[in-house]
Amino acid sequence: DTEDGCISPGAVGYDINCLSSETNVRLPFGRRMPIADLRDRFEDERAVVAAEELTDSGIRLFTESGEREVFEVQTETGQTIRATADHPFSTPNGMTDLEGLAEGDTVFVHPFEGLSHEDPEEFTVLSERDFENENPQLVAFLKRNDLLPLQSTDEAFNRLLKLAGFHTGDGAFRGKQTWFYADPEDLSEIQDDIDALGFSPSKVYSRERTHEIDGNEFTRTEYSMKVSAHGLKQMLLRLGVPDGRKVESDFTLPEWFDRLTDWQRALYLSAFFGAEMSSPSTVSNTNFHCPKISQNRRRNVGDAGEAFMAGIAEALEGMGIRTNPIERFDAETDDTERLRLGIKSDAENLIRFFSRVGYRYNGEKRRKAAVAVQYLRRKEHVIENRARIASEVETLADGGTPVSDLTEQYDINDRFIERSAWNGRSGRPRPPSGFPTFEEYDEATELRENLTVPVEIESIREVGSEPVYDLGVEHDAHNFLANGFVVSNCGVRMVRTNLTYDDVQG
């Protein structure tokens, strides 16, 4: 099909290293999409690339091959991918074809998986009418930078969602200026988004601030950055960002929030969590506290604060993430209430939260979440394997297999086999006694600047033949994230021409 078809070198004899159709490719703004679904839209999309830092790149090539033999790789954390034997994976020794890898070898993965792409409902978020009382020069600037009218499908809107979420937590307005407070590396990321919108962010400022908590006084360096352009402030205000003292404000989530896709809601929430949610931390050697957000509101706007928390909980529920009931109680300050919302702390729920939503504009929390999610995945994978063995042992023992034979059959503690065979198990097994604590795992894990982590291959098995696909990216790193694995992109170089067949024949 010369109008709508895709380039398919595999169909004409090239040996293309490829991935199975359901392999999720990471896309910008926290999205993911099965590689086969990129066929008709790859030229309009960008793929996330694991360069020195994560970045995104245009996609220059999409390949589709006929059925080829594929193998399933599973890691010690339970992450899987299906690929042809010649597909290269990132390892400590560089890109290595799958056929050159074996159980126990190390590959690199990125723990964050994002949310499935959905095409947003298209509607006008802000129009020129919303600014009819503003200076005409301000309106002209916004129109010139394609910020008015602002549509729900605009890339600029995605950036504004992040800025609005973060500013609601750690921002302030001073006169016409918009201020953000964060660590320097996080302010740099905010500056990039502001610059992409056509505004000019300031340099990063620093000053020493003295604080007192529970009678203990300490000094810390506060970093900030401002945007003097009045247009950004007016846009953020109209997007629902509170003005003035937040404790006295009746702000809730924006009225259009429910019309957004999950991945768009996650942009706002993850930025707000980067500012306001507690960092991943453990309550015991292997179990985590529930990450939580807290707010103080004056009593007369406490209901608005509870509605804000309830909206967040509802949005997270739609992403498969469960929360604890909202807590609301008197704060120490007169006429002030404190509201608190936490993420349920069971391992599977935390994995979903850290890997689908997580934190934006906060590198330290993001780094901790990256290690935490891999630790929890490994822990859950070990527990699931132990539960499977316990079930098999109980069944075999009931069928008459001697326990001595079972202890020989399974590479696991004899006491575990005996208890499973004789007593059964009423609940899930615990991790084995030698399983590392999170602190030990954190210290031993080499987290790279792009937040990819090394993980061991647990198994590689042949799974049959199926159609396979690949991408070629424009970035010099020539890789992308597939089911979280850092894999090489298609190495074929192609030239497209407008010459017809008759032109070539002469």
Model-based region annotation:
Residues 41, 61-88, 92-334, 457-489:
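Intein-associated homing endonuclease modules of the LAGLIDADG/DOD-type, together
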Residues 402-410:
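Short alpha-helical "recognition helix" segments of helix-turn-helix
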